[in-house]
């Protein structure tokens, strides 16, 4: 989906509008986006100071069910968290604005949450209301004066009297808009008509112009307007003005609507009132002197300006990593950007840069940057902390914010909340977190906070008991991955990462955390939170609160994705009160891993039916049936139930472990790791689920299945390690903590899973045993449902794996690691290239592989595992998470893919791949936490992804040595895989193979496709075993890495996140190092690297630091570097598709998959990716940039492509040769303004089409390359992009478009 050009002005925009795709694609290329792309609009709206206005996506949030305004609205509104906009999360950096001012829709949360949230918000709102009221009164007063003046000037004749009355009426409306009245000194002239006409105008035109706004004000209901208009009108104009460039019409429409809405809302909801932040005042432009007065501008600001300034203005590409280094989640940064970026979308002016820096600084201190106007309160410019670190300093603040983190988790989708702008949770839920922070945080924080707190307490005790350091660390790792997510939603871990998570609950939680892990607040808290959750969940297993946060997060996340689904899910949770909290928490939890999971879940929610089933099944086996049915259905109908797919997976899980909804939920929860809380009601189930939860996150039922099966069938295999561990650990699980600790030591993720598994294993063993056994046994026989679920899961896992991988690679460098990301991506890519293109995925897969290797390369496993596992762990397996994530971003596709086991394999695979990337990106944006969070576990892996690459690489290398089959199997994976998978060892191999092929798509494709393709049921189930186990094993291994290492790596990662990332970019050689370093070295290099990186991050002078951060590559090498990453990702996507389809043993199934709607959509996306590679290939030729790696990548892509064409012919999708011929797009010397016409990715003319132009679209409406869609282009940061190039880049390479310049030599 993300790859599809999309229907709006820009494919991206269209995608943005889409629940998942859009967001993913929504890099702030708002310029070309059309209003329809609500997601994009945010970008345009970035300029709006008025969050309210930005709410087009947020309407729901604001309580204005503005959904009508944007189709996204409804989605966005879900759960009060604009899921739709959420996608922006992918590009939260720019597109978050929409959420910026999102107010959580109070009503959307559970009463408890709402209450708490409401109380907090109420105070804030009341204050704002008071301000608004005062302003309104003042305005009214002015208005009255004006009115009197007007009246006095007009002799009140009878006729005039009517007019006066009319005027008065109008004025009443205008009441709050005396200013407007002034603006329209002659309201008398059009007073009569103004009422309706103005209102209409407002609604209709919502002119960006002041007059339009005035009209709006005039027309809007007096009361509403009074309260809201003041802020809103002010904001509106500002917004409009800011937006004007971006999407005048669009913005204005939404803005006006918003204004109205705001007024209504404000009136309707006091909180809403806040929606219109009075601060937005007309004085939007009112900037503190230290922004425009050069003599007062701090040196730090000037240095950053110098670093980023280019002859053409401030280079966003250079600024991005610097901002990312603030440790704020991308979402938050996106909101800040949106608030400040008023002139050119994607580019800041000097003053805007200073504003952004100041807002970042403020946000880091835990004060949400609601609008630039708030800066005027500061006598001197606040100096942001821009280091590689996630800003631990704010943690304390963060903690308060952290709570929102939980909500953030849920909000991650929301992302926008400037409020939470600081939500660390941003990383995953980062985006969400920030949003939540703004509105959700309060209540979620309560919920989450509370729960978290309880959880935390438990955890605290546990931690304090000493497990905190070891266990916690280990656990941390595990949590980092599994709990990290949790913590995110639990909020906190991520929040911690982000200096100002802004989650209050977090704060409490963090307080605990702080006490416990002040030294490593980021990672610890994150893990802690998660751990807390987990433990607590384990402990309380279901503290409702726990559940709640989970639910909350989840719900929120879900809500973001699909309120209904989530709600159902929530219901399913059986802890209805927890539902909302669950929502919140979950998302938070999901923030990182959970976010992805949430996505999956979200997708699930998408499937109302599934969800319903969930709901109905909610508390019992009943669910099973529905799920079974659903799953089967999902499986068959996968397409429809994408969410169902997710849900289906869940359902399958549920059926698999029909133990109960909790289980199901657990599954989802699994994702959240919060599953524990999620199944508050059913401890056993929950335990199951939990066990699953963590383990099964990737393959929930599978986990059990896997475990059981593994236990039964695969105990011997390394994969089984996790399973076995589960089995073995059950004893360990005797004491949750023991298990946890042991597992933690072995692998937090595993521990969690194991533990859960133990807990639930026993239980699960019964429950699952049947299910599992049957499922497992049915792996082959009962594939349909169980397997499917498993397959589903597998796909998810793979996807997850991929995603994790991607995340690390792309999202891996979240926080200030934009470059890091690049570097990461590059490194991953390079690694891939080094490894043979598999490294990247290998990393993620590697973790799978590693598990297979079973500890041979724990560090590698750790890293990769962490990537995978960390994420996987997070969700138990990020796989699920990633899955979810994938689903989330590629919700439709992924969902469908997920739903359709086969599709999961095929479309899903691709989705995953793309989504993965997207998600990764998303995470990336808000990912510093994510990464860090994930990093906790994955952090080391991810965070150390810097280190990771080497670590991973060695691991991989080792892995390779160890499991040569991995690579080999990769080759025959499709064919032999089934066998392999069937055999335990092979399973492992397979996993490894998967790893090998792992490039995002590979992983998903290998694993997923294989399961899907080969034996959906068998393969998947088996595979899931492997996948999961691999993950788990990898996870455990990664955990094995040692908490110490984890922490180190995590801490380093924090640094690494930012600096490491640039270091990564700077030292692409690292991968070589890792590669060269043998597995033994893995740990050392990993460690060293972390240390060096962290030291490096800490030491460099600000100027150098920024230079490092920007990860500047020599210009002549930059093209090769960027294209290498691009082609590497494309190869992954295409290879994943190919492997997926190759993995389907039955040609009938393969044909069915390909010809299904999802299959075709998926393949069209793959075709689109291939077309991007063809464009890039021409760009490479045109610029004469030549490198062996690029040539090899192109060859590999063509090779895989030619293989894939055979499948496409089954669905008449084979692209016309002309559609792949972009020779007419090459920019020849002499073309004026060639520089402006060059696509920032492929350097081809954005206005030219492939030669397929003449082909009428109706001829092959299914083709992605008719001239219509081919013509989509976007503008961002001073560059133009083909929609598909930008879309692909943002989703599969990195969240920030590369902005390549056409070399003058052309």
UniProtKB/Swiss-Prot annotation:
Coiled-coil positions are: 113-153
Boundaries of each EH domain copy? Answer: 293-404
What is the gene name? Synrg
Oxidoreductase in keyword set? no
* Sequence segments annotated as region (Interaction with AP1G1): 514-778
Q: Where are the Phosphothreonine residues found in this chain?
A: 1092
Subunit relationships: Self-associates. Interacts with GGA1 (via GAE domain). Interacts with GGA2 and GGA3. Interacts with AP1G1 (via GAE domain), a subunit of adapter protein complex AP-1. Interacts with AP1G2 (via GAE domain) a subunit of adapter protein complex AP-1. Component of the aftiphilin/p200/gamma-synergin complex, at least composed of AFTPH/aftiphilin, HEATR5B/p200a and SYNRG/gamma-synergin, which plays a role in the AP1G1/AP-1-mediated trafficking of transferrin from early to recycling endosomes. Within the complex interacts with AFTPH/aftiphilin and HEATR5B/p200a; the interactions are direct.
What this protein is called in its record is: Synergin gamma
Q: Where is the composition biased (Polar residues)?
A: 993-1005
Q: Which GO terms describe its biological process?
A: endocytosis; protein transport
């Amino acid at each position: 989906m993300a790859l599809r050009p999309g229907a709006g002005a820009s494919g991206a925009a269209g995608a943005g509008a889409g629940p998942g795709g859009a967001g993913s694609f929504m890099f702030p290329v708002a310029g070309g986006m059309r209003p329809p792309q609500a997601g994009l609009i945010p970008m345009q709206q970035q300029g709006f100071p008025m969050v309210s206005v930005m709410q087009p996506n947020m309407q729901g949030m604001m309580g204005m069910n503005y959904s009508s305004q944007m189709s996204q609205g409804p989605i966005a509104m879900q759960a009060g968290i604009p899921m739709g906009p959420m996608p922006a999360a992918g590009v939260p950096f720019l597109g978050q604005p929409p959420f910026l001012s999102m107010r959580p829709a109070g009503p959307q949360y559970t009463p408890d949450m709402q209450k708490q949230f409401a109380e907090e918000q109420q105070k804030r709102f009341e204050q704002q209301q008071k301000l608004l009221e005062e302003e309104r009164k003042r305005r009214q007063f002015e208005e009255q004066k004006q009115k009197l003046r007007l009246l006095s000037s007009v002799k009140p004749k009878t006729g005039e009297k009517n007019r006066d009355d009319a005027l008065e009426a109008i004025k009443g409306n205008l009441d709050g808009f005396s200013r407007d009245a002034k603006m329209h000194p002659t309201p008398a002239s059009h007073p009569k008509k103004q009422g309706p006409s103005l209102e209409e105008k407002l609604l209709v035109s919502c002119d960006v112009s002041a007059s339009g706004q005035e009209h709006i004000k005039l027309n809007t209901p007096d009361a509403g307007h009074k309260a809201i208009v003041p802020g809103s009108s002010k904001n509106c104009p500002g917004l409009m003005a800011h937006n004007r460039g971006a999407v005048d019409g669009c913005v204005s429409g939404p803005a006006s609507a918003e204004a109205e809405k705001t007024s209504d809302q404000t009136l309707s909801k006091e909180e809403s009132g806040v929606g219109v932040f009075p601060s937005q005042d007309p004085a939007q432009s009112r900037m503190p002197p230290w922004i425009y007065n050069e003599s007062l501008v701090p040196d730090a600001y000037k240095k950053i300006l110098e670093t980023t300034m280019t002859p053409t203005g401030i280079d966003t590409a250079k600024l991005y990593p610097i901002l990312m280094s603030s440790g704020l989640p991308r979402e938050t940064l996106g909101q800040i950007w949106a608030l400040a970026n008023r002139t050119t979308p994607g580019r800041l002016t000097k003053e805007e840069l200073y504003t952004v820096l100041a807002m970042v600084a403020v946000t880091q201190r835990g004060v949400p940057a609601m609008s630039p106007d708030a800066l005027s309160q500061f006598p001197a410019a606040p100096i942001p902390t821009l280091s590689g670190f996630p800003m631990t300093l704010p943690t304390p603040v963060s903690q308060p914010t952290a709570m929102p983190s939980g909500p953030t988790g849920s909000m991650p989708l929301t992302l926008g909340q400037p409020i939470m702008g600081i939500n660390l949770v941003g990383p995953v839920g980062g985006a969400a977190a920030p949003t939540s922070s703004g509105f959700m945080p309060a209540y979620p924080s309560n919920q989450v906070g509370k729960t978290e707190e309880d959880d935390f307490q438990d955890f605290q005790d546990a931690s304090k008991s000493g497990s905190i350091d070891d266990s916690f660390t280990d656990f941390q790792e595990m949590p980092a991955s599994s709990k990290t997510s949790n913590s995110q939603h639990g909020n906190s871990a991520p929040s911690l990462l982000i200096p100002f998570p802004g989650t209050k609950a977090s704060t409490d939680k963090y307080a605990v955390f702080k006490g416990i892990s002040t030294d490593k607040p980021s990672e610890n808290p994150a893990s802690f939170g998660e751990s807390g959750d987990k433990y607590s969940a384990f402990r309380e297993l279901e503290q409702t609160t726990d559940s709640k946060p989970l639910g909350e997060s989840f719900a929120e996340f879900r809500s973001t994705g699909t309120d209904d689904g989530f709600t159902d899910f929530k219901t399913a949770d059986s802890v209805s009160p927890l539902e909302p909290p669950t929502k919140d928490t979950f998302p938070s939890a999901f923030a990182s891993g959970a976010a992805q999971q949430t996505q999956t879940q979200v997708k699930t929610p998408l499937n109302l039916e599934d969800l319903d089933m969930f709901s109905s099944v909610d508390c019992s086996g009943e669910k099973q049936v529905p799920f079974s049915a659903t799953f089967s259905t999902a499986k068959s109908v996968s397409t429809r139930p994408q969410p169902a797919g997710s849900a289906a997976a869940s359902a399958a899980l549920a059926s698999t472990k029909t133990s109960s909804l909790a289980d199901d939920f657990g599954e989802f929860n699994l994702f959240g790791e919060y599953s524990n809380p999620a199944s508050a009601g059913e401890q056993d189930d929950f335990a199951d689920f939990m066990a699953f939860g963590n383990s099964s996150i990737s393959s929930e039922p599978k986990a059990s299945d896997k475990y059981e099966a593994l236990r039964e069938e695969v105990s011997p295999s390394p994969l089984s390690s996790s399973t076995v561990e589960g089995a073995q650990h059950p004893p360990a699980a005797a004491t949750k903590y023991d298990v946890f600790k042991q597992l933690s030591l072995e692998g937090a993720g595993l521990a969690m899973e194991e533990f859960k598994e133990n807990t639930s294993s026993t239980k699960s063993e019964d429950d699952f045993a049947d299910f599992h056994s049957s499922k497992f046994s049915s792996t082959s026989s009962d594939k349909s449902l169980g397997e499917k679920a498993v397959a589903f899961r597998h796909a998810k896992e793979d996807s997850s794996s991929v995603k994790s991988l991607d995340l690390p690679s792309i999202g891996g460098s979240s926080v200030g690691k934009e470059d890091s990301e690049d570097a990461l991506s590059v490194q991953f890519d390079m690694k891939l290239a080094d490894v043979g293109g598999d490294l990247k995925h290998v990393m993620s897969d590697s973790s799978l592989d590693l598990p297979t290797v079973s500890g041979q390369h724990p560090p590698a496993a750790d890293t990769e595992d962490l990537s995978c596992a960390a994420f996987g762990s997070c969700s138990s397996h990020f796989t699920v998470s990633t899955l979810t994530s994938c689903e989330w971003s590629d919700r439709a596709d992924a969902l469908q893919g997920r739903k359709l086991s086969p599709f999961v394999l095929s479309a899903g695979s691709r989705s995953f791949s793309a989504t993965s990337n997207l998600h990764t990106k998303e995470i990336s944006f808000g990912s510093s936490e994510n990464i860090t969070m994930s990093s906790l576990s994955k952090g080391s892996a991810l965070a150390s992804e810097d280190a990771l690459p080497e670590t991973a690489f060695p691991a991989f290398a080792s892995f390779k040595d160890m499991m040569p089959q991995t690579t080999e199997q990769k080759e025959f994976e499709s064919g032999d895989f089934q066998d392999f998978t069937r055999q335990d060892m092979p399973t492992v191999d397979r996993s490894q193979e998967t790893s090998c092929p792992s490039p995002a798509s590979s992983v998903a494709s290998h694993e997923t496709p294989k399961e899907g393709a080969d034996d959906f049921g068998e393969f998947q189930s088996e595979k899931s075993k492997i996948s999961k186990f691999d993950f788990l094993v990898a996870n455990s291994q990664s955990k094995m890495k040692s908490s110490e290492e984890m922490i180190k790596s995590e801490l380093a990662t924090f640094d690494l996140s930012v600096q490491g990332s640039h270091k990564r970019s700077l030292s692409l050689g690292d991968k070589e190092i890792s590669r060269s370093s043998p597995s033994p070295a893995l740990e050392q290099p990993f460690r060293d690297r972390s240390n060096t990186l962290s030291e490096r991050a800490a030491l460099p002078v600000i100027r150098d630091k920024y230079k490092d951060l920007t990860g500047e590559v020599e210009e002549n090498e930059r093209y090769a570097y960027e294209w290498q990453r691009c082609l590497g990702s494309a190869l992954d996507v295409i290879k994943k598709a190919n492997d997926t389809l190759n993995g389907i043993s039955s040609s009938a199934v393969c044909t069915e998959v390909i010809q299904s709607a999802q299959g075709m959509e998926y393949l069209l996306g793959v075709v689109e990716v291939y077309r991007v590679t063809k464009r890039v290939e021409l760009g490479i030729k045109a610029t004469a940039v030549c490198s062996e790696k690029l040539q090899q990548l192109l060859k590999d892509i063509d090779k895989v492509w030619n293989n894939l064409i055979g499948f496409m012919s089954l669905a008449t999708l084979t692209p016309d040769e002309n559609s792949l011929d972009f020779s007419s797009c090459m920019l020849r010397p002499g073309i004026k303004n060639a520089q402006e016409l060059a696509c920032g990715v492929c350097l081809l003319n954005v206005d030219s089409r492939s030669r397929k132009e003449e082909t009428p679209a109706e001829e092959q409406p299914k083709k992605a390359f008719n001239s219509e869609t081919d013509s989509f282009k976007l503008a961002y940061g001073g560059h133009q992009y083909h929609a598909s190039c930008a879309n692909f880049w943002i989703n599969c390479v990195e969240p920030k478009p590369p902005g390549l310049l056409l070399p003058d030599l052309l």
